[in-house]
Amino acid sequence: MAKKSMIAKQKRPAKFSTREYNRCKICGRPHGYLKKYGICRICFRELAYKGEIPGVRKASW
């Protein structure tokens, strides 16, 4: 989980557009962000295992 101060800092408007970055909507993690889903890879994996993301299932070949 991200610190509350870091989440609050990210919500403020940045002075420059290049300083803006994405955070996971669930845990606030800034790295491993999946743009299509708006969450990080760890939260994506947990939700996919639970079957809460429609159209996503474990691959096997």
UniProtKB/Swiss-Prot annotation:
Binds 1 zinc ion per subunit. One of its GO terms (molecular function) is rRNA binding. It comes from the Bacteria. One of its GO terms (cellular component) is cytoplasm. InterPro entries: Ribosomal_uS14, Ribosomal_uS14_bact, Ribosomal_uS14_sf. Binds 16S rRNA, required for the assembly of 30S particles and may also be responsible for determining the conformation of the 16S rRNA at the A site. Belongs to the universal ribosomal protein uS14 family. Zinc-binding uS14 subfamily. Part of the 30S ribosomal subunit. Contacts proteins S3 and S10. This is Small ribosomal subunit protein uS14. The lineage of its organism: Bacteria, Bacillati, Bacillota, Tissierellia, Tissierellales. The gene is rpsZ.
